[in-house]
Amino acid sequence: MSPECARAAGDAPLRSLEQANRTRFSFFSDVKGDHRLLLAAVETTVLALIFAVSLLGNVCALVLVARRRRRGTTACLVLNLFCADLLFISAIPLVLAVRWTEAWLLGPVACHLLFYLMTLSGSVTILTLAAVSLERMVCIVHLQRGVRGPGRRARAVLLTLIWGYSAVAALPLCVFFRVVPQRLPGADQEISICTLIWPTIAGEISWDVSFVTLNFLVPGLVIVISYSKILQITKASRKRLTVSLAYSESHQIRVSQQDFRLFRTLFLLMVSFFIMWSPIIITILLILIQNFKQDLVIWPSLFFWVVAFTFANSALNPILYNMTLCRNEWKKIFCCFWFPEKGAILTDTSVKRNDLSVISG
């Protein structure tokens, strides 16, 4: 073998290793340069505000739903939705720590768990929304036939399936996220980053496609079909009301209107989820494409703001829910605090109204 061939053969593994390092996305690790403190302060302010609003909103929504005397399947699923939001925002302190230190100094365990828990909570959220829409559609059909809804054991099984499937679906992220040294643009030396390293490109492609399909598109299709069916039932019920004004019929319509109000709220939650989670899904797919197109540049700062936008969904969910379904409860709380006598009157008059609520029945 000629010296030129031997030198080329020896340099090939180095070039391959250098290319592999260049394709590793650093996610939250980023060298910000001279304005590091200012940028980190802005990022901290934004995420801290999202964290505070989300924590307060979800905890208050949890208390309002949990204090109802009767909690059905829908209420349990809504509680599950708020729990998933709380799990999702638990990643914010870790994200802020990395944005301040730039390098990953939290250890391998946190690296394995951070993106795993974020993906797990997102999967639980969309599956819960799909389960609520499907359960409400089935409940309305069974209500018209005089059939009772699922019992406590069925609810426990449903929640176990949602969390179990989400945990298994996100498991590859827990396995393949690891801490590696890498030199980032603007850095004088290598720093530790938490990045995703798949054994094969084929495995990464198959997981990305299957996860987006099964945990994003299919639940969205279930929600759309369920809402379409409920709209058909609601329109048919209103037409029957114009023909017959019997008490039983009017009572059935009142329940349908409450269901329609609940579905309108859940529809808003679903729309906000898809709007605020679509950018992160697209960004993850672009990171996958980066393996094939080296000229495609995705900055870690852009990834951070996309994730921050996704975090904001956890703050928006309880706001939408409280504004549309819990306005009377919040009015009662404020009146009890500022006007005790008026609050007592509202408390007495709202008992029967709460008993008629489908979400608590």
Curated annotation (Swiss-Prot):
CDD domains: 7tm_classA_rhodopsin-like (cd00637). The keyword Transmembrane helix applies. One of its GO terms (molecular function) is G protein-coupled receptor activity. Phosphorylated at two clusters of Ser and Thr residues located in the intracellular C-terminus. Prerequisite for FFAR4 internalization via an ARRB2-dependent pathway. InterPro entries: GPCR_Rhodpsn (IPR000276), GPCR_Rhodpsn_7TM (IPR017452). Glycans are attached at N21. PANTHER family: FREE FATTY ACID RECEPTOR 4-LIKE (PTHR45695:SF37), LEUCOKININ RECEPTOR-RELATED (PTHR45695). GO terms for biological process: adenylate cyclase-activating G protein-coupled receptor signaling pathway; brown fat cell differentiation; ghrelin secretion; inflammatory response; negative regulation of apoptotic process; negative regulation of cytokine production; negative regulation of inflammatory response; negative regulation of somatostatin secretion. GO terms for cellular component: ciliary membrane; cilium; endosome membrane; lysosomal membrane; plasma membrane. Signal peptide: none annotated. Keywords: Cell membrane, Cell projection, Differentiation, Disulfide bond, Endosome, G-protein coupled receptor, Glycoprotein, Inflammatory response, Lipid-binding, Lysosome, Membrane, Phosphoprotein, Receptor, Transducer, Transmembrane, Transmembrane helix. Residues 1-45, 99-112, 178-204, 290-295 are extracellular. Highly expressed in lung and colon. The keyword Cytoplasm does not apply. The modification Phosphothreonine is found at T347, T349. PROSITE patterns: G_PROTEIN_RECEP_F1_2. Its main location: membrane. It holds the Pfam family 7tm_1. This is Free fatty acid receptor 4. The chain crosses the membrane at residues 46-66, 78-98, 113-133, 157-177, 205-225, 269-289, 296-316.
